[in-house]
Amino acid sequence: MLQNSELLQEYLPIAIFFGIAVLLSVLIMILPNLLSTKKYNKDKLEPYECGFEPFSDARSKFDIRFYLVAILFIIFDLEIAFLVPWAISLNTIGKMGFFSMMFFLFVLIIGFIYEWTKGALDW
């Protein structure tokens, strides 16, 4: 069992790295707003379309079903991201790892069936 000082010594570089990453991220987001000059005019606020006047409004309505399909894609993409390492280490994780992944897949299948019955996939 690691003592507190050993634990701190092991995780201190990770904590420092995380702190520097957060600090740099915040600086990169805040500094442009503080240092830039803001000159708004009509031409800068319009969307650019290959040097021509815009043909239509850039803020057109977008069907919500595209978002549902995108969310489904993200969910099942994450499923694959969890399944690949699980399949590689299946020999070493034992029965508990197997049944926990089966439960995870069961929950995803139940969610997929629910969306299917609610008509989220019908166009």
Swiss-Prot record:
The keyword Lyase does not apply. InterPro entries: NAD(P)H_OxRDtase_bac/plastid, NADH_UbQ/plastoQ_OxRdtase_su3, NDAH_ubi_oxred_su3_sf. Keywords: Cell inner membrane, Cell membrane, Membrane, NAD, Quinone, Translocase, Transmembrane, Transmembrane helix, Transport, Ubiquinone. The chain crosses the membrane at residues 11-31, 68-88, 93-113. It is found in: Cell inner membrane. Its EC number is 7.1.1.-. It is an enzyme of class 7 (translocase). It catalyses: a quinone + NADH + 5 H(+)(in) = a quinol + NAD(+) + 4 H(+)(out). The keyword Signal does not apply. It is a multi-pass membrane protein. GO terms for cellular component: NADH dehydrogenase complex; plasma membrane. Pfam families: Oxidored_q4. GO terms for molecular function: NADH dehydrogenase (ubiquinone) activity; NADH:ubiquinone reductase (non-electrogenic) activity; quinone binding. Gene3D superfamilies: NADH:ubiquinone/plastoquinone oxidoreductase, chain 3. Belongs to the complex I subunit 3 family. HAMAP family: NDH1_NuoA. NDH-1 shuttles electrons from NADH, via FMN and iron-sulfur (Fe-S) centers, to quinones in the respiratory chain. The immediate electron acceptor for the enzyme in this species is believed to be ubiquinone. Couples the redox reaction to proton translocation (for every two electrons transferred, four hydrogen ions are translocated across the cytoplasmic membrane), and thus conserves the redox energy in a proton gradient. NDH-1 is composed of 14 different subunits. Subunits NuoA, H, J, K, L, M, N constitute the membrane sector of the complex. PANTHER family: NADH-UBIQUINONE OXIDOREDUCTASE CHAIN 3. This is NADH-quinone oxidoreductase subunit A. It comes from Rickettsia prowazekii (strain Madrid E).
